[in-house]
């Protein structure tokens, strides 16, 4: 067994996420309290009792998803103590902001440091967002076709932002370009789904946010990782602190090539993928990334609540 832990990104959040873990594991609860103190706000109350509208603001979403993921990770360690070593965790990865959760789980950053940088990152991205920009999910096409059709409309700014799985890609840019692209893609994709976001994330339109957060990332006191980080920007397993920082800085305007990254992990022998956090988005993507031949050898599991935690080894042993 060679295990990779996966941490979700924006879009997986919902009101009430992580509540049963908070109520049942002392270290998970302590982690929530740490974030409240660091950010000087009752983020826990927002996560459990707030509104979707407030939670989806990126300066709230990003630290919220991180703390839920880390609370679940700490609950796993509390539940299994030394038994967790049996998983043979050899790497971690996160989708966009999830990369910071991965860094925290790997011991590179403290919970407080991670919450602080994600709050700042989310705030810069929120300020950089524009009502005239957005994102569109393209289902049932391929990146070559998508890129050719982007080129054909000669956009002001429209780029592939996320290559999520086989047949699922997200484009990001100006709404006027997205509308032209939708017309161009008629008959070339199964579905085109506008995403409920107020910005063109992972595109050049986020350059100001990237510039503004660069110094904050540079100042981070990143420790050597316990597990190598498969980073979004480079697509490589990183352990060097300077490389980790550079990739974090460049990630905001660069595409998340998740599909390619996960294929890389499979090629390097990873056979067990455990998503830790709200919902099961990455689990669903992973099931579409693996080939029919690989499905027999690869285990894909998501953990987002107490029941999932307590049945983890049953799933691993029985699947």
Can you say where each PLM-predicted feature lies in the sequence?
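Alpha/beta catalytic cores of group-transfer enzymes, especially the acyltransferase/condensing modules
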Residues: 10-12, 39, 106-253
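Short hydrophobic/charged patches on amphipathic alpha-helices used for structural packing
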Residues: 259-263
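Non-catalytic positions within long, well-ordered alpha-helices that form the structural scaffold/packing
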Residues: 266-267
């Amino acid at each position: 067994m060679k295990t990779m832990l996966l941490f979700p990104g924006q879009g997986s959040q919902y009101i009430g996420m992580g509540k049963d873990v908070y109520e049942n594991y002392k270290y998970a609860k302590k982690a929530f309290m740490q974030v409240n103190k660091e950010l000087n706000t009752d983020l826990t109350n927002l996560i459990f009792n707030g509104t979707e509208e407030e939670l989806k603001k990126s300066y709230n979403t990003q630290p919220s998803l991180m703390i839920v993921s880390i609370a679940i990770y700490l609950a796993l360690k509390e539940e299994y103590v030394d038994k967790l070593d049996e998983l043979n965790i050899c790497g971690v990865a996160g989708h966009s902001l999830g990369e910071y959760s991965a860094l925290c789980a790997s011991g590179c950053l403290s919970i407080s440091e991670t919450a602080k940088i994600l709050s700042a990152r989310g705030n810069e991205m929120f300020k950089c967002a524009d009502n005239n920009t957005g994102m569109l999910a393209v289902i049932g096409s391929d990146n070559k076709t998508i890129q050719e059709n982007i080129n054909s409309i000669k956009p002001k700014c429209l780029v592939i932002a996320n290559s999520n799985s086989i047949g699922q890609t997200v484009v990001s840019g100006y709404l006027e370009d997205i509308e032209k692209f939708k017309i161009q893609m008629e008959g070339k994709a199964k579905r085109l789904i506008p995403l409920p976001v107020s910005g063109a994330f992972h595109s050049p339109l986020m350059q100001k946010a990237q510039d503004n957060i660069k110094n904050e990332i540079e100042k981070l006191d990143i420790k050597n990782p316990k597990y190598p980080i498969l980073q979004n920007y480079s697509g490589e397993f990183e352990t060097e602190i300077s490389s980790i920082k550079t990739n974090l800085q460049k990630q905001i305007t660069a595409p998340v090539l998740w599909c390619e990254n996960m294929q890389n992990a499979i090629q390097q022998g990873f056979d067990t993928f455990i998503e830790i956090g709200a919902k099961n988005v990455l689990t669903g993507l992973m099931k579409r990334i693996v080939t029919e031949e690989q499905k027999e050898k690869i285990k894909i599991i998501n953990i987002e609540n107490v029941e999932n935690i307590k049945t983890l080894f049953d799933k691993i042993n029985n699947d």
